[in-house]
Amino acid sequence: MVSRVKRYFLEIKDFSKTVDLNLPENFQIILDDKDNFHLNRFFYKQIGVDHYWRDRLLWSDSEWVKYVTNKNLETHVLKKGEDLVGYYEQEYHPGSNEVELINLGVLKEFRGLKLGSTLVNHAIASASRKNPRRMWVHTCSLDHKHALQNY
């Protein structure tokens, strides 16, 4: 049986509304310092395995380093205490004054706690500080069942 993958392209152009993070107690979202590409690769593999994230699985260490050290890329990490919970990556495109939400996800053991929407809200708030023309994301029917409604 062949099933079609539905793709969705979404954008935000109005950043005037304040976004409520609803960050639970003992959770924090930190901006990664780009020292360690292993963190991005870990999240990509662990979260992506359930959603058919495949394009970066064959990347070499040097490809990961080049990606993570891009001066316009930010990786934000959600933690509970010292435990890793989830992340998102966003890239600022200065030529078009846009922010692209590249990847976002929560580790399996933390799903069902509405932390994905917390990360989305944080990403919007973070992007808005750059005063972009728009923020955009694409998702598809292979992503988490709540991804589209969260965006």
Where would I find each of the regions flagged by the language model?
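Conserved beta-strand-loop-alpha-helix junction that forms the acyl-donor binding cleft
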Residues: 111, 137-147
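Acyl-donor-binding surface of acyltransferase catalytic domains
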Residues: 1-33
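A conserved beta-strand-loop-helix scaffold within acyl/acetyltransferase catalytic domains
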Residues: 57-59, 68-75, 79-98, 102-106
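Short amphipathic alpha-helix that is part of the acyltransferase structural core
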Residues: 22-56
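Conserved GNAT acetyl-CoA-binding A-motif
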Residues: 127-139
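Conserved acetyl-CoA pyrophosphate-binding loop and the N-cap/start of the following alpha-helix
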Residues: 110, 114-122
